[in-house]
Amino acid sequence: MAKKGVNKQARTNSKLDQLVTSLERLTVGSMQRKSNRQRPKSRKTSGRVVTAPVSSAALIRYKAPSLNGNSMDSVRLASKSLVIEAVKVGIEYQVSVVPLVPCIQHTWLSGVACYWSKYRWRSCRLVYIPYCSSSFTGYVSMGLSYDYADAIPSDETEMSALKGYTTTSAWAGSEGIKMLSYPTGAVPSGAVVLSLDCASMSKPWYPYISAVAATNLGEKQPELLNQYTPARAFIGTGGGMQGVNGLTAGRVFMVYDIELIEPVSPAMQENLSSTGRSKIDQSISPLTGADFEIVRKVSAISQIQ
Protein backbone atom coordinates (compact mmCIF):
# COMPACT_ATOMS: atom_id res chain seq x y z
CA MET A 1 0.00 0.00 0.00
CA ALA A 2 2.84 2.37 0.81
CA LYS A 3 4.43 1.68 -2.61
CA LYS A 4 1.19 2.51 -4.45
CA GLY A 5 0.92 5.78 -2.55
CA VAL A 6 4.45 6.72 -3.59
CA ASN A 7 3.72 5.98 -7.29
CA LYS A 8 0.50 8.02 -7.18
CA GLN A 9 2.33 10.96 -5.64
CA ALA A 10 5.03 10.75 -8.33
CA ARG A 11 2.43 10.82 -11.14
CA THR A 12 0.76 13.83 -9.53
CA ASN A 13 4.08 15.69 -9.31
CA SER A 14 4.83 14.87 -12.97
CA LYS A 15 1.50 16.31 -14.12
CA LEU A 16 2.11 19.45 -12.07
CA ASP A 17 5.54 19.85 -13.67
CA GLN A 18 4.02 19.51 -17.15
CA LEU A 19 1.33 22.08 -16.31
CA VAL A 20 3.92 24.57 -15.02
CA THR A 21 6.03 24.09 -18.18
CA SER A 22 3.01 24.72 -20.42
CA LEU A 23 2.10 27.89 -18.52
CA GLU A 24 5.67 29.16 -18.82
CA ARG A 25 5.62 28.60 -22.59
CA LEU A 26 2.32 30.43 -22.98
CA THR A 27 3.57 33.36 -20.90
CA VAL A 28 6.81 33.72 -22.88
CA GLY A 29 4.98 33.48 -26.24
CA SER A 30 2.43 36.10 -25.20
CA MET A 31 5.18 38.50 -24.13
CA GLN A 32 7.02 38.03 -27.44
CA ARG A 33 3.87 38.73 -29.50
CA LYS A 34 3.12 41.83 -27.42
CA SER A 35 6.68 43.05 -27.91
CA ASN A 36 6.37 42.61 -31.67
CA ARG A 37 3.10 44.55 -31.75
CA GLN A 38 4.62 47.43 -29.81
CA ARG A 39 7.71 47.66 -31.99
CA PRO A 40 7.55 51.04 -33.82
CA LYS A 41 7.21 50.96 -37.60
CA SER A 42 9.77 52.70 -39.76
CA ARG A 43 8.63 56.04 -41.19
CA LYS A 44 9.07 57.06 -44.80
CA THR A 45 11.20 60.12 -45.39
CA SER A 46 10.31 62.88 -47.84
CA GLY A 47 13.86 63.47 -49.02
CA ARG A 48 15.27 61.73 -52.06
CA VAL A 49 18.83 61.35 -53.32
CA VAL A 50 19.23 60.99 -57.09
CA THR A 51 22.19 58.90 -58.20
CA ALA A 52 23.86 59.72 -61.47
CA PRO A 53 23.16 56.90 -63.96
CA VAL A 54 26.02 55.10 -65.65
CA SER A 55 24.15 55.22 -68.96
CA SER A 56 20.67 56.38 -69.91
CA ALA A 57 18.74 57.62 -72.92
CA ALA A 58 15.50 59.49 -73.57
CA LEU A 59 12.94 57.89 -75.87
CA ILE A 60 9.89 60.00 -76.75
CA ARG A 61 7.09 58.46 -78.79
CA TYR A 62 4.21 60.22 -80.50
CA LYS A 63 0.87 60.13 -78.71
CA ALA A 64 -2.26 61.68 -80.20
CA PRO A 65 -3.84 64.54 -78.22
CA SER A 66 -6.90 63.80 -76.12
CA LEU A 67 -9.94 65.71 -77.37
CA ASN A 68 -13.30 66.01 -75.60
CA GLY A 69 -16.26 68.28 -76.30
CA ASN A 70 -19.59 68.45 -74.49
CA SER A 71 -21.14 70.85 -77.00
CA MET A 72 -20.39 73.08 -79.98
CA ASP A 73 -19.48 75.88 -77.59
CA SER A 74 -16.50 74.28 -75.83
CA VAL A 75 -13.72 71.76 -76.21
CA ARG A 76 -11.20 70.24 -73.82
CA LEU A 77 -7.71 69.17 -74.88
CA ALA A 78 -4.90 67.27 -73.19
CA SER A 79 -1.51 67.02 -74.86
CA LYS A 80 2.11 68.25 -74.80
CA SER A 81 4.10 71.02 -76.51
CA LEU A 82 7.82 71.67 -76.81
CA VAL A 83 8.30 75.21 -75.47
CA ILE A 84 12.10 75.43 -75.06
CA GLU A 85 14.06 73.42 -77.59
CA ALA A 86 17.46 73.96 -75.98
CA VAL A 87 18.07 74.71 -72.30
CA LYS A 88 21.60 76.10 -72.22
CA VAL A 89 23.81 75.97 -69.13
CA GLY A 90 26.94 78.06 -68.61
CA ILE A 91 29.05 79.58 -65.88
CA GLU A 92 26.83 82.69 -65.80
CA TYR A 93 23.27 82.72 -64.51
CA GLN A 94 20.70 82.79 -67.32
CA VAL A 95 16.90 82.92 -67.26
CA SER A 96 14.43 81.92 -69.98
CA VAL A 97 10.79 83.02 -69.84
CA VAL A 98 7.78 80.92 -70.85
CA PRO A 99 4.37 82.66 -70.80
CA LEU A 100 1.63 80.21 -69.84
CA VAL A 101 -0.66 81.06 -72.73
CA PRO A 102 -2.03 78.79 -75.47
CA CYS A 103 -0.72 81.08 -78.25
CA ILE A 104 2.94 79.99 -78.02
CA GLN A 105 4.16 79.76 -81.60
CA HIS A 106 5.28 76.55 -83.30
CA THR A 107 2.98 74.44 -81.13
CA TRP A 108 -0.04 72.40 -82.11
CA LEU A 109 -2.08 74.08 -79.38
CA SER A 110 -1.62 77.56 -80.88
CA GLY A 111 -3.26 76.39 -84.12
CA VAL A 112 -6.33 75.16 -82.24
CA ALA A 113 -6.73 77.82 -79.54
CA CYS A 114 -7.03 80.66 -82.07
CA TYR A 115 -10.51 79.35 -82.97
CA TRP A 116 -11.80 79.99 -79.45
CA SER A 117 -12.42 83.19 -77.51
CA LYS A 118 -11.50 82.16 -73.95
CA TYR A 119 -9.55 79.47 -72.15
CA ARG A 120 -8.69 78.10 -68.73
CA TRP A 121 -6.03 75.66 -67.62
CA ARG A 122 -7.29 72.52 -65.91
CA SER A 123 -3.68 71.43 -65.58
CA CYS A 124 -0.49 73.07 -66.81
CA ARG A 125 2.97 71.69 -66.00
CA LEU A 126 6.44 72.33 -67.37
CA VAL A 127 8.65 69.25 -67.53
CA TYR A 128 12.42 69.41 -67.91
CA ILE A 129 13.88 66.52 -69.92
CA PRO A 130 17.69 66.24 -69.94
CA TYR A 131 19.70 64.85 -72.83
CA CYS A 132 23.20 65.46 -71.52
CA SER A 133 25.59 63.01 -69.88
CA SER A 134 25.78 62.49 -66.12
CA SER A 135 29.19 64.19 -66.12
CA PHE A 136 27.57 67.46 -67.25
CA THR A 137 28.23 70.32 -64.81
CA GLY A 138 25.50 72.78 -63.85
CA TYR A 139 21.96 73.06 -62.56
CA VAL A 140 18.46 73.89 -63.78
CA SER A 141 15.82 75.62 -61.64
CA MET A 142 12.23 76.66 -62.30
CA GLY A 143 9.69 78.96 -60.65
CA LEU A 144 6.39 80.76 -61.30
CA SER A 145 5.43 84.44 -61.22
CA TYR A 146 1.72 85.29 -61.06
CA ASP A 147 2.19 89.01 -61.79
CA TYR A 148 3.62 90.35 -65.05
CA ALA A 149 4.56 93.60 -63.32
CA ASP A 150 7.29 91.70 -61.44
CA ALA A 151 10.83 91.76 -62.78
CA ILE A 152 12.63 88.70 -64.09
CA PRO A 153 14.78 87.08 -61.33
CA SER A 154 18.42 88.04 -61.64
CA ASP A 155 19.94 85.26 -59.52
CA GLU A 156 19.11 81.98 -57.81
CA THR A 157 18.25 83.73 -54.55
CA GLU A 158 15.36 85.56 -56.21
CA MET A 159 14.35 82.45 -58.14
CA SER A 160 14.18 80.35 -54.97
CA ALA A 161 11.54 82.70 -53.50
CA LEU A 162 9.05 81.98 -56.31
CA LYS A 163 6.09 79.67 -55.95
CA GLY A 164 6.68 76.14 -57.16
CA TYR A 165 10.45 76.57 -57.08
CA THR A 166 12.35 73.42 -57.95
CA THR A 167 16.00 72.83 -58.79
CA THR A 168 18.15 69.90 -59.83
CA SER A 169 21.39 68.89 -61.52
CA ALA A 170 21.23 69.47 -65.26
CA TRP A 171 21.53 65.72 -65.99
CA ALA A 172 18.61 64.68 -63.73
CA GLY A 173 14.90 64.36 -64.52
CA SER A 174 14.64 61.76 -67.28
CA GLU A 175 11.77 60.13 -65.34
CA GLY A 176 9.55 62.97 -66.57
CA ILE A 177 9.42 61.41 -70.05
CA LYS A 178 6.43 59.34 -68.93
CA MET A 179 4.39 62.54 -68.51
CA LEU A 180 4.66 63.31 -72.23
CA SER A 181 2.50 60.27 -72.97
CA TYR A 182 0.14 60.80 -70.02
CA PRO A 183 -0.24 64.60 -69.58
CA THR A 184 -2.94 64.31 -66.92
CA GLY A 185 -1.27 61.50 -64.96
CA ALA A 186 0.64 61.62 -61.71
CA VAL A 187 4.12 63.10 -61.51
CA PRO A 188 6.69 60.26 -61.48
CA SER A 189 9.24 60.17 -58.70
CA GLY A 190 12.42 61.89 -59.84
CA ALA A 191 10.75 64.05 -62.52
CA VAL A 192 11.64 67.77 -62.63
CA VAL A 193 8.24 69.46 -62.88
CA LEU A 194 6.85 72.96 -62.36
CA SER A 195 3.06 72.94 -61.80
CA LEU A 196 0.66 75.85 -62.20
CA ASP A 197 -1.80 76.21 -59.31
CA CYS A 198 -4.96 76.06 -61.43
CA ALA A 199 -7.23 76.14 -58.37
CA SER A 200 -6.09 79.62 -57.32
CA MET A 201 -6.45 81.65 -60.51
CA SER A 202 -7.53 85.29 -60.21
CA LYS A 203 -10.06 84.80 -63.04
CA PRO A 204 -12.24 81.83 -64.01
CA TRP A 205 -11.57 82.41 -67.75
CA TYR A 206 -8.87 84.29 -69.67
CA PRO A 207 -9.36 85.90 -73.11
CA TYR A 208 -7.28 84.47 -75.92
CA ILE A 209 -4.50 86.76 -77.21
CA SER A 210 -2.27 86.19 -80.24
CA ALA A 211 1.48 85.78 -79.89
CA VAL A 212 2.21 89.00 -81.81
CA ALA A 213 -0.24 91.08 -79.78
CA ALA A 214 1.07 89.59 -76.55
CA THR A 215 4.65 90.38 -77.55
CA ASN A 216 3.84 94.00 -78.27
CA LEU A 217 1.86 94.39 -75.08
CA GLY A 218 4.63 92.77 -73.05
CA GLU A 219 7.09 95.33 -74.38
CA LYS A 220 5.06 98.44 -73.54
CA GLN A 221 2.67 97.53 -70.70
CA PRO A 222 3.51 94.07 -69.33
CA GLU A 223 1.19 94.45 -66.33
CA LEU A 224 -1.79 94.35 -68.72
CA LEU A 225 -0.89 90.78 -69.63
CA ASN A 226 -2.39 89.74 -66.30
CA GLN A 227 -5.74 90.04 -68.09
CA TYR A 228 -4.76 87.39 -70.64
CA THR A 229 -2.60 84.87 -68.80
CA PRO A 230 -2.45 83.65 -65.18
CA ALA A 231 1.32 83.34 -64.88
CA ARG A 232 4.69 82.96 -66.53
CA ALA A 233 7.43 80.45 -65.83
CA PHE A 234 11.11 81.18 -65.34
CA ILE A 235 13.78 78.60 -66.15
CA GLY A 236 17.16 79.49 -64.66
CA THR A 237 20.51 77.83 -65.34
CA GLY A 238 24.03 78.24 -64.02
CA GLY A 239 27.02 76.54 -62.45
CA GLY A 240 28.40 75.33 -65.76
CA MET A 241 31.97 74.72 -66.80
CA GLN A 242 34.49 77.50 -66.34
CA GLY A 243 35.01 79.47 -69.53
CA VAL A 244 32.00 77.92 -71.27
CA ASN A 245 28.69 79.73 -71.59
CA GLY A 246 25.92 77.99 -73.43
CA LEU A 247 26.12 74.19 -73.56
CA THR A 248 22.77 72.53 -74.25
CA ALA A 249 21.57 70.37 -71.37
CA GLY A 250 17.97 69.47 -72.21
CA ARG A 251 14.50 70.61 -73.25
CA VAL A 252 11.36 71.89 -71.58
CA PHE A 253 7.93 70.55 -72.51
CA MET A 254 4.52 71.84 -71.48
CA VAL A 255 2.02 69.10 -70.62
CA TYR A 256 -1.47 70.47 -70.23
CA ASP A 257 -5.19 69.96 -69.91
CA ILE A 258 -6.99 73.04 -71.26
CA GLU A 259 -10.63 73.99 -71.81
CA LEU A 260 -11.60 76.36 -74.65
CA ILE A 261 -14.99 78.07 -75.00
CA GLU A 262 -16.90 80.41 -77.34
CA PRO A 263 -15.81 79.69 -80.94
CA VAL A 264 -14.60 82.64 -83.02
CA SER A 265 -12.89 83.32 -86.34
CA PRO A 266 -9.05 83.28 -86.13
CA ALA A 267 -8.93 86.49 -88.18
CA MET A 268 -10.74 88.28 -85.37
CA GLN A 269 -8.35 86.85 -82.79
CA GLU A 270 -5.08 88.02 -84.35
CA ASN A 271 -5.66 91.75 -83.69
CA LEU A 272 -3.57 92.53 -86.78
CA SER A 273 -4.00 95.24 -89.42
CA SER A 274 -3.51 94.70 -93.15
CA THR A 275 0.20 95.52 -92.70
CA GLY A 276 0.63 92.58 -90.36
CA ARG A 277 1.35 94.79 -87.32
CA SER A 278 -0.54 94.72 -84.06
CA LYS A 279 -3.41 97.17 -83.68
CA ILE A 280 -2.43 97.61 -80.04
CA ASP A 281 0.68 99.62 -80.99
CA GLN A 282 2.00 99.64 -84.55
CA SER A 283 5.02 101.70 -83.51
CA ILE A 284 6.54 98.71 -81.70
CA SER A 285 8.40 96.15 -83.75
CA PRO A 286 6.91 92.68 -83.15
CA LEU A 287 8.82 89.83 -81.51
CA THR A 288 11.04 92.02 -79.33
CA GLY A 289 9.24 91.72 -75.99
CA ALA A 290 11.58 90.66 -73.21
CA ASP A 291 8.81 88.62 -71.61
CA PHE A 292 8.21 86.61 -74.77
CA GLU A 293 11.63 85.45 -75.85
CA ILE A 294 10.21 82.11 -76.83
CA VAL A 295 8.34 83.62 -79.83
CA ARG A 296 11.30 85.49 -81.29
CA LYS A 297 11.81 82.78 -83.87
CA VAL A 298 8.51 83.63 -85.55
CA SER A 299 9.03 84.93 -89.08
CA ALA A 300 6.93 86.27 -91.95
CA ILE A 301 4.53 88.19 -89.73
CA SER A 302 3.55 90.40 -92.66
CA GLN A 303 1.99 87.38 -94.34
CA ILE A 304 -0.73 87.19 -91.68
CA GLN A 305 -3.80 88.98 -92.95
From Swiss-Prot:
Pfam families with a match to the protein in the record: Viral_coat
Subcellular location(s) of the protein: Virion
Coiled-coil ranges (or none): none
UniProt keyword list: Capsid protein, T=3 icosahedral capsid protein, Virion
Region (Disordered): 30-49
Biased composition (Basic residues): 34-46
Position of the signal peptide: none
Gene3D superfamilies: 2.60.120.20
Keyword DNA-binding (UniProt): no
Protein name: Capsid protein
